[in-house]
């Protein structure tokens, strides 16, 4: 079993089995956004979950104008609503990383400009990716539902605590111990259009990301 965690300047890359994830902790907002911007599974189309963060200040042209930056990341509730780490106002500090027999993991201390902080833990295993956020207050994890690659539309199904996206037979499923809410935002990168959602919770929130091949659903 191949498991690893590597650091490349402001980018942190995690590997375990067929899963790969990449954080950008100091993004260039002409191209990227701070947070978890890439998560793939070997053999599955990279666009299905997220293959590139979304920026509202891109140096390249898109067919729609983005109203927000975006990565998979935490948001903390304030009097103005949720404030997300993808806005560039959160400092990510890697405090712990490692590999066990069953997973690789990384723990970040996330500090906002007002001094508030929380921990964000990414775990990769054969089962998929898991993001856990802990701290004082109310938190959300924002995540994307891939909609359209310019030719093919996806199918999206949602319950209170799960959401699945199916694209050419491949499926990405998000599962949370909180409640899923639509942010009513559609954003784009060079791979296509995404609809943005959040999973909400108190003091702690977990989001699991699992990707499946077409044959998984036909057995």
Regions found by a protein language model. Name each.
Residues 1-180, 184:
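Extended polysaccharide-engagement surfaces of secreted carbohydrate-active enzymes
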Residues 166-219:
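Beta-strand-rich recognition/accessory modules
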